[in-house]
């Protein structure tokens, strides 16, 4: 069975093809699909290609189906490694998760920042 694909366009114009079911993890995109207000391309105007690529990677990993079995322990380990990024990137991932309404990524980003603050690894400038 082939899955429906949609195209996402980042703020800097780069195009990404993603499975619709994976994209539905982004509540903003899911609402656009349900309201049929998408042509062939969904603009993601507040997210650069660099960050959108990471968001898609996260959504692909967290997309649950028979083809993607993953234990909770494996997923937690993957999440921890995924968030090993600089403050700038974490901040932009957090904003993208907020704009796209990806609750699990937003919670992960918030927890990462809280852990960094508690461990004195967050630079306040």
From Swiss-Prot:
Tissues in which the UniProt entry reports expression: Restricted to siliques.
Predominant place of localization: nucleus
Gene3D superfamilies: Potassium Channel Kv1.1, Chain A (3.30.710.10)
Gene Ontology CC: nucleus; SCF ubiquitin ligase complex
GO biological process terms held by the UniProt record: auxin-activated signaling pathway; jasmonic acid mediated signaling pathway; protein ubiquitination; response to auxin; response to jasmonic acid; ubiquitin-dependent protein catabolic process
Protein's pathway: Protein modification; protein ubiquitination
Subcellular locations according to the entry: Nucleus
Entry keyword annotation includes Nucleus: yes
Region (Interaction with the F-box domain of F-box proteins): 94-125
Keyword field: Nucleus, Ubl conjugation pathway
Keyword Ribosomal protein: no
Known partners and oligomeric status: Part of a SCF (SKP1-cullin-F-box) protein ligase complex.
Family: Belongs to the SKP1 family.
Function as written in the Swiss-Prot or TrEMBL entry: Involved in ubiquitination and subsequent proteasomal degradation of target proteins. Together with CUL1, RBX1 and a F-box protein, it forms a SCF E3 ubiquitin ligase complex. The functional specificity of this complex depends on the type of F-box protein. In the SCF complex, it serves as an adapter that links the F-box protein to CUL1.
Name assigned to this protein: SKP1-like protein 7
Taxonomic source organism: Arabidopsis thaliana (Mouse-ear cress)
């Amino acid at each position: 069975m082939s899955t429906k694909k949609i195209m996402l366009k980042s703020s800097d114009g780069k195009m990404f093809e993603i499975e619709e079911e994976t994209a539905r993890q982004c509540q903003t995109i899911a609402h656009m699909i349900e309201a049929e207000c998408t042509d062939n391309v969904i603009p993601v105007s507040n997210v650069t290609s660099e960050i959108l690529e990471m968001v898609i990677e996260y959504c692909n990993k967290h997309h649950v189906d028979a083809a993607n079995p993953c234990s909770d322990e494996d997923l937690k380990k993957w999440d921890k490694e995924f968030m090993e990024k600089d403050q700038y990137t974490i901040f932009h991932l957090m904003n993208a998760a907020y704009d796209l309404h990806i609750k699990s990524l937003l919670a992960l980003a918030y927890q990462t920042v809280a852990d960094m603050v508690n461990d004195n690894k967050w630079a306040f400038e």
